[in-house]
Amino acid sequence: MRIHLLLIAILTFAGAATAAEDQAAAWSDAGQMVVVTTPGWSADHGTLRTYAHTADGWKEIGQPAPVTVGKAGVAWGLGLNAPREDGPVKREGDLRSPAGVFAIGEAFGYAGKADTTMPYRALSATDYCVDVSGSPQYNRIVDARVVGEQAVQGSTEPMRRDIHAHGDQRYREGFVIEHNPQQRAQGGSCIFAHLWKSPADATTGCTAMAPALMQRLLAWLKPQDHPVFVLLPEPAYAKLQAAWRLPALGEGNR
């Protein structure tokens, strides 16, 4: 009986380890990682670090920097990791930034070109990110001239905020965080890294930062390195760091 129970325990442990490795495999080709940690699920601010993968493992690049996240904190999103429910779960309009591991999508901005090798979208006055759940264009940046005005009807995310929102500069530079690429209804949409209005202003679900930090990220990110974006509360990061093969964070992580 004891041998039988021991065998069950070994098999259970092995299965759990394999599952963790399988999850980490989804970003095993990542050579660059942008890591944001927050003090907890309800915090609206965090710390951003950048890492490059070397033969010796993850190496921190540059200095940690402050960022702001959702006004209501963070919640598990839909990215490269398996869906989780050991914490809040991201929903459309909940004012939370999605937590997990995500591919980094195209860069975007108001200028015709940017200092980046990432795919870049020069935004126009007719570009919208559709946040209307149930729309075929849900969670997509589209040009109303191409998809038609009706396709963006009801969307609250014009990408040229300087034109549509009284000179707002927050989308002057940014990049897409690939949350909910499968367009799950009410799963959350239009998640970006973008400029902050001020260090004290949290977001409606994105991650915001100083212009100098954004410029450093855009110049550093390389599409051939398959960069990923990680956002986790510190307790969740500590719990998942080894299994998800994430960088070990330095001290003073606040």
Regions from the PLM with identified roles:
Residues 15-19:
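Short, intrinsically disordered, charge-balanced linker/junction segments flanking boundaries
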Residues 4-14:
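Bacterial N-terminal signal peptides
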Residues 209:
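A conserved hydrophobic position in a structured secondary element of the catalytic/binding core
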Residues 20-204, 212-254:
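Cell wall/extracellular polymer interaction/catalysis modules
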